[in-house]
Amino acid sequence: MIENRKHLGLAKIGFLCLVVVIWIIPFAASAQEVAVGQATATVQAVLAVTSVQDLNFGNVLQGVPSSADIDVVAEAADFSVTGSGGAEVALYLQLPEYLWNSTNTDRMQISFSSTDCEIDANIGTAATKVAPVVADPYNLPATALHATNNILHVYLAGTVYPAVDQAVGAYSADIVLTAAYTGN
């Protein structure tokens, strides 16, 4: 019997502890609050770089330097860059030092001055530029794409120097424009 009383006493104490715990838990929980935040990101449009027009010197004479005019559509190189409107892009031109004939047996010197490049963040052509900015083709500034048209154009001119004994034929070289978002 004493043993039953001990168990009954322990059961009462256990029950009281359970009641106290159940009574305290709501008060402890009310001292906390929860807030939910979100992580967000917006992926910008992919940049697309297109060669609209090649740099074209036309027919040149042996020993006579020839320049392409940056304002003539048929002569000036025209690259378009499209992407997320208003986003800033870093631009880099990889320019050749020589044009090579089709058999790679003769080359012609080509050069670019610090004023042979223009950047215009508008829709247009070399002849209809809206607000061109003169730029050094070896050190192009970061430029924002047009906010609503999502575009900019890079125009390029240059000069070739045929030798007096330049081999007859067509000459060419690659001009590469690289564009990348700056995050600004």
Q: What positions do the PLM features span?
A:
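Short stretches within intrinsically disordered, low-complexity N-terminal or propeptide regions
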Residues: 13, 70, 76, 92, ...
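Short N-terminal leader segment in a subset of presequences, especially plant chloroplast
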Residues: 9-12, 118-120
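Bacterial N-terminal signal peptides
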Residues: 14-26
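N-terminal small/polar-rich segments of proteins
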Residues: 30-109, 140-184
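Terminal beta-strand-rich extracellular "head" domains
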Residues: 101-139
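Intrinsic disorder/low-complexity segments
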Residues: 27-30, 48, 124, 128
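N-terminal secretory signal peptides that target proteins for export/translocation
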Residues: 1-10
